[in-house]
């Protein structure tokens, strides 16, 4: 039995969850999210709890059980608290700034790199070496943060590049000269 799938999702006050066939819609104070869920997993709403049941112990159903519960839980958490992902810029002259809605990165290329967030996502630049991505959809927040990090991945010799806050980059020893 999936330990994640067994736990019910608690619906906080101010959040409404509706199921229309396979479509799950979650409305809350920060916005609205909807997603298609797998038809095999049985979902029941009792009071302020959502429970998930799988039809059999097949490998596919066991995998889907916890996944569907986690997806709905992330939607509920997103419309109440929201998600954020912080990134740090390490390197001489590496700077981040905002120009209107766009993020402008100066990370050692001959040109500044501009990144435009998609609808529903917000980029903040609290300092010129820190970038914070915020939104209600956990997947999209993580994807945008990953795209920003991919502009200049952290390198193992000097540690220069864009990394997630708190990420450990394994360092390598340089070549020894004669």
Curated annotation (Swiss-Prot):
One of its GO terms (cellular component) is cytosolic large ribosomal subunit. Coiled coil: none annotated. Gene3D superfamilies: Ribosomal protein L6, alpha-beta domain (3.90.930.12). SUPFAM superfamilies: Ribosomal protein L6. GO terms for biological process: cytoplasmic translation. One of its GO terms (molecular function) is rRNA binding. Keywords: Ribonucleoprotein, Ribosomal protein, RNA-binding, rRNA-binding. This protein binds to the 23S rRNA, and is important in its secondary structure. It is located near the subunit interface in the base of the L7/L12 stalk, and near the tRNA binding site of the peptidyltransferase center. Belongs to the universal ribosomal protein uL6 family. PANTHER family: 60S/50S RIBOSOMAL PROTEIN L6/L9, LARGE RIBOSOMAL SUBUNIT PROTEIN UL6M. This is Large ribosomal subunit protein uL6. It comes from Shouchella clausii (strain KSM-K16) (Alkalihalobacillus clausii). The lineage of its organism: Bacteria, Bacillati, Bacillota, Bacilli, Bacillales.
């Amino acid at each position: 039995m999936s330990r994640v799938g067994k736990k019910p999702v608690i619906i906080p006050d101010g959040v409404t969850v509706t199921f229309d066939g396979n479509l799950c819609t979650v409305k809350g104070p920060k916005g609205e999210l909807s997603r298609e869920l797998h038809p095999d997993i049985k979902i029941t709403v009792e009071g302020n709890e959502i429970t998930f049941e799988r039809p059999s112990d097949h490998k596919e159903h066991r995998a889907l059980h916890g996944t569907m519960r986690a997806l709905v839980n992330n939607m509920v958490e997103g419309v109440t608290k929201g998600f954020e992902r912080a990134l740090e810029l390490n390197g001489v002259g590496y700077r981040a700034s905002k120009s209107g809605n766009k993020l402008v990165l100066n990370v050692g290329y001959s040109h500044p790199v501009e990144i435009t967030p998609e609808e529903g996502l917000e980029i903040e630049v609290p300092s010129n070496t820190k970038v914070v991505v915020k939104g209600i959809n956990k997947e999209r927040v993580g994807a945008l943060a990953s795209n920003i990090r991919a502009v200049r991945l952290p390198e193992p010799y000097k540690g220069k590049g864009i990394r997630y806050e708190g990420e450990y980059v394994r360092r390598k020893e340089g070549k020894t000269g004669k």
